[in-house]
């Protein structure tokens, strides 16, 4: 028996067979081996198996994909083997009891020159739970469960455990999906999350939607208490680290004013010969979080900390993230240091990593360092001021080196949510990245590169932060879209892929666009065509940073990837442990962990964005009828999104625009009947017509 025989049997059986029938045809020969082969073929997307224990051959009559539902009751499904192709339309009658996010087997049907998909079977029920609100029915007689996920708008919900789970109006609850029949969902209520009238509870419910843990397990908290030993009590460990001590250095932290999980600290020294030493000291989380402990297991499940508008959902319990591991000022801390030397031009000429003990002498924040850079206002000791001056000097040199080599850089604003003490949104404002944030970023990037290069040269298993080059066609599309703004770099496709030429194009955008918001939107449009950075075992480099080798070393309090990096640095460099079995285990673990943390990172980013969106809707909910100036951020088939000065964004639906509008996919513009058009960057005046808190949706209309 081999894979080819299995595939031949499935193919001869009309490309579908039950696992039992397959085993029978193979005379039940070596069932564990059959299981392994099927698993491998499934992972390679050659075969797929379903909840009904059937096996399908993919690429012929049957395809596999994830179903995405529209609130109106129909859906779309993509083909995993052709992810770039347009998704297939699935009418309500062809859903076969499946719903949003389900992994399904489907077949394509051509009906009167129209192509649609029919769901054949369910492979995997991705969504197990629904979050929603208990609301009173229109006639006031009943309490209904309304899911927050708009993909389930068209479903009726029946609660199976109403008697043992009394419900009240305005409750936000979590429900487990039990079964589905046509457009009827049967659920069991699992827990009450909070009150829909409280902003803080609404935010917490979004974290629950994304299945991000909001509480730690008891075993994890118990382990956190066990390892909570002040540095001063670990005399032997202190003595061991004293040979590489940073206690006499002017080490400082620079973070957000509200930050509590302080991972990183810096010290810069300018030498007499004009060269520089940069010390990047990172909290030694691996000293406290050992592999396979409850702390470690839950940290891997979480993957990273998630930063919401009014709270942090940390990767580690706060006793570690905000206290024991955090590089709080005037307290001895264990750290891993990356010491780098730079020449007079800002080029790194040496690097080393070691365990150390340190004290952060000053706790600085970005605002005050930005103020110092702008106006030379300083409220701390003179020694720290001198160090910051040298840090700024080195930062400027490194920045120029990175730009020359092709690091893609541009400034973008982010929406910042301002809340009162009750977590009610009182303001949304645009936050610009300052010079101090860029300084820390450049120093952290340098340390990440240095660490990655050290281990890469040792040819040992390691976790890398890879960023693949963009797809050539995607990048051509981006360059093409710039022509409607009068920007045409006249590059060959090969030249377009060169990061240096991308930087030159970004510079031209800056020079030719008079409006900074238009420039920002054009810069952001590039990101849509970029590959997503991810964690992997094999190094392929980082395109965006124009780096041959990159990892994440600088944030082990809030990223599990960095915790892995610290452990392997200690194993390889400090303990010089190259045991072959241990290396094989490292390789296997990196592969497993990378899959998990790539997913948790995406989930956290999506959750953070959804919270910001929910907060902007809440902020605009009492501004219905108000008129504002805005900028078109993107034109799509169904309308235009308009961004206000404070980065609040709303949709002008195509039904509220002029009739007979045509969408130009190439230039991303909506063409009106008089040949004028709507495109990104245009200034418009809008009126707010709705802000639906439950749907998290803002609607505008244009005002003449």
Question: At which residue positions do the language-model features occur?
Answer:
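Charge-lined substrate channels and their catalytic hotspots, especially those that engage the 3′ end
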Residues: 1-279, 286-332, 370, 669-679, ...
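Electropositive polyanion-binding surfaces
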Residues: 24, 169, 174, 180, ...
């Amino acid at each position: 028996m081999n894979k080819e025989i299995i595939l031949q049997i499935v193919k001869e059986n009309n490309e579908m067979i039950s696992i039992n029938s397959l085993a029978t045809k193979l005379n039940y020969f070596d069932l564990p081996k059959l299981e392994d082969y099927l698993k491998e073929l499934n992972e390679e997307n050659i075969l797929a198996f379903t909840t009904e224990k059937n096996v399908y051959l993919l690429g012929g009559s049957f395809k596999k994909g994830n179903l995405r539902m529209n609130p109106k009751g129909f859906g779309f499904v993509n083909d995993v083997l052709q992810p770039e192709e347009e998704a297939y339309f699935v009418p309500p009658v062809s859903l076969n009891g499946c719903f949003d996010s389900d992994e399904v087997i489907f077949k394509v049907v051509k009906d009167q020159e129209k192509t649609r998909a029919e769901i054949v079977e369910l492979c995997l029920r991705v969504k197990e739970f629904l979050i929603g609100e208990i609301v009173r029915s229109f006639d006031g007689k009943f309490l209904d469960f309304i899911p927050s996920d708009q993909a389930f708008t068209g479903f009726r919900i029946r609660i199976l455990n109403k008697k043992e789970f009394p419900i009240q109006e305005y409750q936000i609850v979590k429900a487990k999906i039990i079964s589905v029949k046509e457009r009827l969902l049967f659920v069991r209520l699992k827990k009450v999350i909070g009150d829909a009238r409280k902003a803080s509870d609404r935010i917490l419910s979004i974290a629950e939607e994304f299945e991000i843990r909001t509480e730690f397990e008891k075993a994890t908290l118990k382990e956190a208490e066990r390892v909570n030993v002040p540095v001063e009590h670990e005399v032997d460990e202190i003595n061991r680290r004293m040979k590489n001590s940073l206690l006499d250095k002017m080490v400082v932290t620079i973070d957000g004013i509200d930050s509590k999980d302080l991972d990183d600290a810096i010290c810069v020294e300018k030498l007499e010969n004009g060269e520089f030493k940069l010390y990047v000291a990172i909290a030694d989380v691996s000293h406290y979080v050992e592999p396979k402990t409850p702390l470690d297991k839950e940290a891997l499940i979480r993957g990273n900390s998630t930063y919401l508008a009014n709270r942090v959902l940390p990767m580690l319990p706060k006793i570690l993230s905000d206290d024991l591991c955090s590089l709080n000022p005037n307290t001895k801390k264990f750290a891993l240091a990356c010491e780098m030397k730079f020449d007079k031009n800002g080029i790194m000429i040496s690097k080393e990593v070691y365990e150390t003990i340190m004290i952060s002498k000053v706790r600085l924040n970005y605002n005050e360092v930005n103020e110092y850079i702008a106006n030379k206002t300083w409220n701390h000791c003179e020694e720290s001021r001198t160090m910051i001056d040298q840090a700024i000097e080195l930062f400027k040199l490194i920045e120029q080196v990175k730009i020359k080599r092709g690091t893609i850089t541009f400034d973008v604003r982010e929406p910042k949510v301002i809340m009162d003490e009750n977590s009610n949104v009182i303001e949304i404002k645009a936050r610009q990245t300052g010079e101090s944030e860029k300084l820390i970023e450049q120093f952290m990037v340098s340390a990440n590169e240095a660490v990655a290069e050290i281990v890469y040269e040792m040819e040992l298993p390691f976790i890398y932060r890879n960023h693949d080059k963009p797809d050539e066609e995607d990048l051509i599309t981006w360059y093409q879209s710039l022509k409607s703004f009068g920007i045409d770099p006249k590059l060959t496709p090969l030249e377009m892929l060169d990061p240096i030429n991308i930087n030159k194009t970004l510079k031209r955008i800056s020079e030719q666009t008079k409006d900074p918001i238009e420039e920002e939107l054009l810069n952001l449009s590039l990101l849509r065509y970029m590959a997503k950075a991810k964690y992997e075992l094999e190094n392929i480099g980082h395109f965006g940073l124009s780096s041959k080798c990159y990892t994440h070393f600088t944030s082990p309090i809030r990223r599990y990837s960095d915790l892995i990096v610290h452990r392997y640095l200690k194993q390889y460099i400090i303990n010089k442990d190259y045991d072959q079995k241990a290396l094989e285990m490292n390789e296997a673990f990196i592969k497993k962990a990378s899959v998990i943390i790539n997913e948790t990172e995406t989930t956290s980013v999506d959750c953070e964005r959804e919270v910001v969106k929910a907060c902007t809707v809440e902020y605009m909910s009492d501004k219905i009828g108000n008129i504002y100036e805005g900028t078109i951020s993107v034109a799509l088939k169904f309308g235009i999104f308009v961004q206000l000065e404070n980065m609040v964004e709303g949709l002008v639906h195509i039904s509220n625009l002029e009739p007979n509008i045509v969408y130009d996919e190439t230039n991303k513009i909506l063409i009106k009947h008089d040949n004028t058009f709507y495109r990104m960057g245009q200034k418009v005046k809008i009126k707010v017509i709705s802000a639906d808190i439950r749907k998290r949706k803002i609607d505008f209309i244009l005002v003449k």
